Amino acid sequence: MPDKEGHPSPQEMDLGQVLAALADPWRRQVVRELAAAPEGTARTCASFALPMAKATRTHHFRVLREAGLIHQEDCGNARLTRLRRAEIDGRFPGLLDLVAAETPQPSTADPQAAL
């Protein structure tokens, strides 16, 4: 059963839910940025500079958290986010490598590029 913050245990991580979370290009961008950082790096949600309303950003982070891809903890008035690298690699070997290797397309990396 997920903890009170909605983090599932590694055994509860569902491949379908993980793939659904990764289907969105903005969420993949968050995972790629966290995967590129040193192990255990924690960032605030605002540090990702996603071009969307705060409520939409919150939704995207909730989807990633409930899928088990990230761990979030409150720190004052900020919420720190870190990648659950060891748990993901243990449950779905190679998945993070595939996400990290993706080259974002201009239309998904920057919605304004298509205009």
Annotated model-derived regions:
Residues 1-16, 32-37, 84-115:
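Amphipathic alpha-helical dimerization/coiled-coil segments
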Residues 17, 51, 63, 109-110:
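Generic signature of intrinsically disordered, low-complexity, basic-rich segments
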Residues 17-21, 25-53, 75-87:
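N-terminal helix-turn-helix DNA-binding core of bacterial DNA-binding proteins
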Residues 46-69:
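Canonical helix-turn-helix DNA-binding module
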Residues 65-67, 78-81, 97-99:
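A general structural signal for short secondary-structure boundary/capping elements
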Residues 72:
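Short beta-strand "wing" residues that participate in macromolecule-binding interfaces
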